[in-house]
Amino acid sequence: MKVLPASGLAVLVTALKFATADPNLLAATPRTFRSNYHLAQAYLDKYYTKKGGPQAGEMVARESNPMIRRIKELQIFFGLKVTGKLDQNTMNVIKKPRCGVPDVANYRLFPGEPKWKKNILTYRISKYTPSMSPTEVDKAIQMALHAWSTAVPLNFVRINSGEADIMISFETGDHGDSYPFDGPRGTLAHAFAPGEGLGGDTHFDNAEKWTMGTNGFNLFTVAAHEFGHALGLGHSTDPSALMYPTYKYQNPYRFHLPKDDVKGIQALYGPRKIFPGKPTMPHIPPHKPSIPDLCDSSSSFDAVTMLGKELLFFKDRIFWRRQVHLPTGIRPSTITSSFPQLMSNVDAAYEVAERGIAFFFKGPHYWVTRGFHMQGPPRTIYDFGFPRHVQRIDAAVYLKEPQKTLFFVGEEYYSYDERKKKMEKDYPKNTEEEFSGVSGHIDAAVELNGYIYFFSGRKTFKYDTEKEDVVSVVKSSSWIGC
């Protein structure tokens, strides 16, 4: 558990104080009023009491009854009719499950606009929930973080030990940060604004039933909201926004960050820059992805690799499978149908056939597979020894005879020794200087029968490793029957 910082908390909770009921609050029968009143006062104390609080005289000057003032604040925030009374619509809001971060102060950015001063953030899941398998939790968390990284120049790298920027855990009741959970329903989770100590940490109430679907509280939905706080956003008054404080299920596989959230997060970090070539980061696929027309396109594949006895060609949300020596029977499939964890837009891939494993790269992460079966959660590309300024791989190819993998990044490439498990010295080197006849940006690469095939735009260069020169050039689309 991190040490509680002196400031920068996203969660501001005060002690509950039960005052004498004011007749002006009454908007229910006497039988239900008392329970509504106590529930409402606890809710308002938790979510509508500003840190430090205004002076008592100021509170009285604004409203004869401070609770009426706070009820009106709640009604204004949620777009309700402003009555100052605990009417049915107001009580309906109060009874909804919600985030544990209060609604006071600025509704988009936290006071002082705290934000991270770096663009690579680490995260660690230190405690899991029994409601879901660890693999499901890992997937939901990764997808929730990815929802934000599509809009801003932030990348998230998972670590499995030590102190991360964003520590994630499932907790019960009083868990040591002074903001205890309240059991099933009520407060689902809370997060701390960027900063030292607890800054960025995100806690989920382990008393809830968490799920990847709708039979319980969807972890992706709640996690994506809480990570907005961990990045510096407050609550939004826009009911369509992810940062709206009450729970509303979002389908993880069809989710796109709403406009209000995009504006808020980009006000802190600016937009994510899109460079020529492949997208900087993958996009979550729509329900029915369209098939790229590579037969009439100047674009190349995103990645190419052998997998068993098949060649796989990746483009956007689609991949093609074909037997090496059989150019017929090639059909496209969605990436999610065979690799649900990858979702879309693979940057690079390669297979080490003698070990029976393959590697798939997206942004600063990679996945390991045996055949079409994922082997655990995503890992960081820095495991290979890349310098920190490298945030994505353009292409990768494994060379069987020297047992080395070449990684192409921009105009350069790195050489990784698969036997020693370390990056070779004196790299990176310039690609065009080292591979005679190869030109242009390398989008993908694969080795077959002693030749390296470099995919660059609409061209594929066949490079003879013995002659150390290109021996032919073909259309990239010819590989899938065009």
UniProtKB/Swiss-Prot annotation:
Keywords: Autocatalytic cleavage, Calcium, Disulfide bond, Extracellular matrix, Hydrolase, Metal-binding, Metalloprotease, Protease, Repeat, Secreted, Signal, Zinc, Zymogen
Enzyme's top EC category: hydrolase
Motif position, Cysteine switch: 97-104
Domain of life: Eukaryota
Matching PROSITE patterns: CYSTEINE_SWITCH (PS00546), HEMOPEXIN_2 (PS51642), ZINC_PROTEASE (PS00142)
Tissue: Expressed in the enamel organ.
Compartment annotation: Secreted, Extracellular space, Extracellular matrix
One Gene Ontology cellular component: extracellular region
Positions of transmembrane segments: none
Cofactor(s) recorded in Swiss-Prot or TrEMBL: Zn(2+); Ca(2+)
Disulphide-bonded residues: 295-482
EC numbers for this chain: 3.4.24.-
Swiss-Prot/TrEMBL GO biological process terms: amelogenesis; extracellular matrix disassembly; protein catabolic process; proteolysis
Residues engaged in binding Ca(2+) 1: 163-165, 196-197, 199, 201
Modified how: Autoactivates at least at the 106-Asn-|-Tyr-107 site.
Keyword presence, Transmembrane: no
A Pfam cross-reference name: PG_binding_1
Binding site residues for Zn(2+) 2: 175, 177, 190, 203
Hemopexin repeat spans: 292-342, 343-388, 390-438, 439-482
Propeptide: 22-106
The record's note on its domains: The conserved cysteine present in the cysteine-switch motif binds the catalytic zinc ion, thus inhibiting the enzyme. The dissociation of the cysteine from the zinc ion upon the activation-peptide release activates the enzyme.
Family in the record: Belongs to the peptidase M10A family.
Purpose: Degrades amelogenin, the major protein component of the enamel matrix and two of the macromolecules characterizing the cartilage extracellular matrix: aggrecan and the cartilage oligomeric matrix protein (COMP). May play a central role in tooth enamel formation. Cleaves aggrecan at the '360-Asn-|-Phe-361' site.
Protein name: Matrix metalloproteinase-20
Organism: Mus musculus (Mouse)
Organism placement in taxonomy: Eukaryota, Metazoa, Chordata, Craniata, Vertebrata
Gene: Mmp20
